[in-house]
From Swiss-Prot:
Species name: Xenopus laevis (African clawed frog)
Pfam families: ZER1-like_2nd
InterPro entries membership: ARM-like, ARM-type_fold, LRR_dom_sf, ZER1-like_C, Zyg-11_UBL_adapter
Source superkingdom: Eukaryota
Protein name: Protein zyg-11 homolog
Amino acid sequence: MEESSPKSLLDITLLYLSTHLEKFCWERQDGTYCLQDAAIFPQEVADRLLQAMAVQRQLNEVTVGIFRGNQLRLKRACIRKAKISAVAFRKAFCHHKLIELDATGVNADITITDIISGLSSSKWIRENLQCLVLNSLTLSLEDPYERCFSQLSGLRVLSITNVLFYNEDLADVASLPRLESLDISNTSVTDITALVACKDILKSLTMHHLKCLKMTTTQILEVIRELKKLNHLDMSDDKQFTSDIACRLLEQNDILLHLVSLDISGRKHVTDKAVEAFIRHRPQMQFVGLLATEAGYSEFLSGEGCVKVSGEANQTQIAEALRRYSERSFFVREALFHLFSLTHVMDKANPEMLKLVVIGMRNHPTNLPVQLAASACVFNLTKQDLAAGMPVKLLADVTHLLLEAMKHFPNHQQLQKNCLLSLCSDRILQDVPFNRFDAAKLVMQWLCNHEDQNMQRMAVAIISILAAKLSTEQTAQLGAELFIVRQLLQIVRQKTSQNMVDTTLKFTLSALWNLTDESPTTCRHFIENQGLELFMKVLETFPSESSIQQKVLGLLNNIAEVKELHTELMCKDFIDQISKLLHSVEVEVSYFAAGIIAHLVSRGEETWTLSSSMRETLLEQLHSAILSWPTPECEMVAYRSFNPFFPLLACFRTPGVQLWAVWAMQHVCSKNPVRYCSMLIEEGGLVRLHRIRDHMCADPDVLRITITILDNLDRHLKKHGNPPCQKPPFTK
């Protein structure tokens, strides 16, 4: 499937061009754009550029100017959701030799009569335009207005749904000499008798949800009987009416004998027996729409055979429904509701189904019932190991839409819960590209407004992972939001008072650890909100929980790195607590305790406000503790950069401080050389290590580890060459 393949070079180029037009254009006197390069684009490329601009919502008065001349020759034009005037439309598009135009949902400044008037100004378009889509537009701002559809004599396909389109307009359309396909869904038509005028040419008729229709069932059937060429008929509805039209139609054996496709989804009184009999009288039939009816449950109508079925009885029918009804919110919701029921237990990933859910979500971003059902389906389709079988690009699309749903419905608890359940996936959080900064903010906002314990655990788990993936700048920006630190500290306070060690506490500590990393503002928020006192309480409450101690000390390391907060840590009780943990048998605990001491001691005697004898004792203990550490079997810590270590490397008067810094560097460079050797070289670590190697008074233990690091760096350079400029992501 396409989601598992990289984008084509053309797609990447057109996406960039469509979103950075200002770099490739000059401005005319009227402010519109004109491409700088005079090269002529191939017609297919021009069509795709226009479509890319439409998808990216980049079509406006200024940007459509690039289509005025002959550099970009259009044939199939998509201007969906464009924000343009009638004048801009005429200048940009009406000189092209168009055979198709999709103007769905263009802004209210341009009407259907404006569009047809512009198109009709070209003799070529009048005679050759074949397909015109004018859904969700205003017909005219004038009353009365001149009906003008008949001017487009070459038109074969017309879609004019969700429009105040009346019987007289239908009569005008029915006079088109080549009209083969017509969609008048959700219009104001009350009488379809005018369609008899095109009975000998009309092959496809879609009239979904004709809510204003005032004809009797018999009268409707009489018109349909006349449409002898019809091979597609859509009479579906949103279950709002009790009309017996579907039931009566299925009883007719002598009409629609050439029918290939019939859609009666949402209609009443439909049975499997009647549908099956209707199809058997028309063996050429290929599709029947039965969603939101009582039919579709027989083996004959399963959708697995020659006849495709949109329905709710099985996943095949539901997939067909999602494909065909992606722009009909009611049917999308119905299909998703039944999909959720059928996907509680899945043993195999289904990317095709997830793609259909994505399309439904994207087409109806502000429809709560759709988003609610879709987010629930996303969870079923991606939970546990199922996400591993999904293409990354597809998961990226899903994640973006989940975040959009959270933004649109911030106060709907069930929808927020659905989205969090789906986001709480290692595959998504670790491997999928999406805006992690926005996601972290959204989840934090949810966390601050809800107290559901199960959801709280998920939220802090998500935040702890997201925070580790952010850049230093993003982490600082996120941590600068005071409410975030305050809320996380409140969770820690609650768990500590309950004497409870659980995953929520661990994830919350990890989140705070990651948020304070190389972020002085967040560290200050931590101190100002009594974080230090709280964390000392945590250490006292859980004296035998090494995993808790490690996270607490890791965060306190981040605080100790901030020079401006040095005095906040110059507290005897605090130093005594850290000194005890320096002697922990757990190397991970001792390591972080040593880091705190190293940073505090490194700033010199003049900044040490406690007793000098304590400082000397700590330095001795620091040195001996480091030398006692066994080599860890795995990487026990991760760093964004080595910048916090560099000041420590210059502390020749306190070799214990240097020793901790080089031990840390050696540890990560030996466990993950590709990442950390490159980082150390890139950040200028070689020069600093050379200074230690060449210093006459370098401590032997420090010198030994320094030489080991330099040897590792030398091997790395020989194997990989100079490191790239881009840094790898950070995780903790």
